[in-house]
C-alpha cells in the first residue's frame, strides 16, 4: 500500500509541475527519447558530454540526457518574425545518463540514476529580453520548491562549474535531512546565442535582417531528488506528510 502511495505521489508531483508550467505560459511538448548526433551538437551535449550519453551504435542515435535536446532542436533552421518571440515550451521526459566515473555516496539511492524523470522548461528569446526571461525562470523554479515546503537555496555557478555552452547558470538545491547535505534539483541557464548559432535559430528584425535568438532552459524540476527530499523532510509520527499543494492531486495528505 505504501509503495502504491509513493508511486502515485511521484505522478502527482509531475502533474503539479506541468500544470505550473502551463499556467506560466509554457506550451507542453511530448519529446522523443532518441535523437541523432546533430541534435546533440546543436545544444552542446556533443562532443563535450559524449561519454555521459548512451549511444546506439547500429543506428548512430543517442538517448536524451535531458528534454532540452529535442525541444530546443525543434527550432533548428527556423527564422521567426520578431513578433513571434518568445517561444516557451515545457516537456516531461525520462532522462538517460551513463554517469561515467561516478562512485561512492553520490551514486546511492536516488542521488544519481542512469534513468530519471524530469520536467524541463525552454525559452527561445529576443536577445534584448533573455536576462529578464532568466529571472522569470528562476522565479518559476523558486515557486515550485517553496510550494513543496522544502528547505532550499540558490547558487550562481562559477565558470569552471558551468557547461561551456552557458553564459550564466544558477543551481537550485534542496536539503537532504538523511544525508545532511544539499542536493541539486534544478539548473537554470541562459546560453545567449551559443546554441542558436549552432542551430541557426534566428529571427527577422525590424531592419529586415536576420539575427540569432537567445536560448534558455531550466529543470522544473528533477523528480527523484524532489521525492527523496519530501520523504526525508516530511516525516511525522503519523507518517509522511504530503505538502498542501499536492493534496488536490494525490487525494490524501499522509503516507502511512
Predicted segments with their positions:
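Single conserved hydrophobic/aromatic residue that forms the stacking wall/gate
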Residues: 1-8
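TRNA-recognition modules of translation machinery and tRNA-sensing kinases, especially anticodon-binding
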Residues: 9-10, 14-256
Amino acid at each position: 500500500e505504501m509503495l502504491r502511495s509513493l508511486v502515485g505521489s511521484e505522478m502527482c508531483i509531475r502533474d503539479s509541475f506541468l500544470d505550473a508550467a502551463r499556467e506560466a505560459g509554457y506550451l507542453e511538448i511530448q519529446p522523443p527519447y532518441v535523437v541523432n548526433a546533430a541534435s546533440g551538437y546543436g545544444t552542446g551535449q556533443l562532443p563535450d558530454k559524449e561519454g555521459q550519453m548512451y549511444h546506439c551504435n547500429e543506428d548512430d542515435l543517442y538517448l536524451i540526457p535531458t528534454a532540452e535536446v529535442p525541444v530546443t532542436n525543434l527550432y533548428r533552421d527556423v527564422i521567426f518574425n520578431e513578433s513571434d518571440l518568445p517561444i516557451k515550451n515545457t516537456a516531461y521526459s525520462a532522462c538517460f545518463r551513463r554517469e561515467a566515473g561516478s562512485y561512492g555516496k553520490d551514486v546511492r539511492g536516488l542521488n544519481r540514476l542512469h534513468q530519471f524523470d524530469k520536467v524541463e522548461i525552454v525559452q527561445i528569446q529576443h536577445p534584448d529580453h533573455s536576462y529578464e526571461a532568466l529571472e522569470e525562470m528562476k522565479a518559476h523554479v523558486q515557486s515550485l520548491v517553496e510550494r513543496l515546503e522544502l528547505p532550499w537555496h540558490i547558487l550562481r555557478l562559477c565558470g569552471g562549474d558551468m557547461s561551456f555552452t552557458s553564459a550564466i547558470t544558477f543551481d537550485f538545491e534542496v536539503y537532504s535531512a538523511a544525508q545532511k547535505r544539499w542536493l541539486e534539483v534544478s539548473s537554470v541557464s541562459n546560453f545567449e546565442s551559443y546554441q542558436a548559432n549552432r542551430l541557426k535559430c534566428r529571427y527577422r528584425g525590424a531592419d529586415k535582417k536576420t539575427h540569432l535568438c537567445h536560448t534558455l532552459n531550466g529543470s522544473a524540476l528533477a523528480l527523484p531528488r524532489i521525492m527523496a527530499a519530501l520523504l526525508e523532510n516530511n516525516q511525522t509520527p503519523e507518517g509522511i506528510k504530503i505538502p498542501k499543494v499536492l493534496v488536490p492531486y494525490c487525494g490524501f495528505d499522509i503516507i502511512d
